[in-house]
Amino acid sequence: LFGHGNRHLPYLIHAFDRAVQRGIGQDSGRLELRQVAQQTLDGGWQPIYRPGEALQPAPPFVPKPPPCPERLTVLLETPLRLRLAEKLMGADAFQFGALFANLLRRISLLITFHADTPLEADFAGLSRAGWTIRQRAARLRWHEWTRYSSRQDALLQMGGLVGEIELDGTGLEPFWPYLWLGQWTHAGKGAVMG
């Protein structure tokens, strides 16, 4: 959870627990909530809740990025759905600028709505500069998947790019804090769907 979203943690746990007991998805699959864990400053995980016990979250913290590496591999583990000129961007058309512009917008919105201090950055300048970054290598493929929308009573296409992009660290310093934060966000069409 980001910033002010942490205030809603007890309600999210309760809602999730109720939802999984009732069944989720088109086939009403049932699950059991056994534990909730929170990431610690050192990158580990600490249990903060088990059913029948009190919720004991640690205070939220803002992680500090390490120094920018000399070389960087961006892993796209979940489908990244980007649009460029009203078309979905495939593996052959991938450009770092599109990824970075979406990531910067996503982080900016998260900070605007979930933090007490607005993000101060040259958004236009950073976005323009992102289009000048070239990847060393890209091993991307399209991964198609669907999700069921109860509201629309239909399956929705949610496919996107998965794989990895290798970047030379030279010139990445202005982008690094956002790329590093991006490991905890989604960036692209449908990002709010998780």
What do the predicted segments below correspond to?
Residues 1-194:
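RNA-interacting cores
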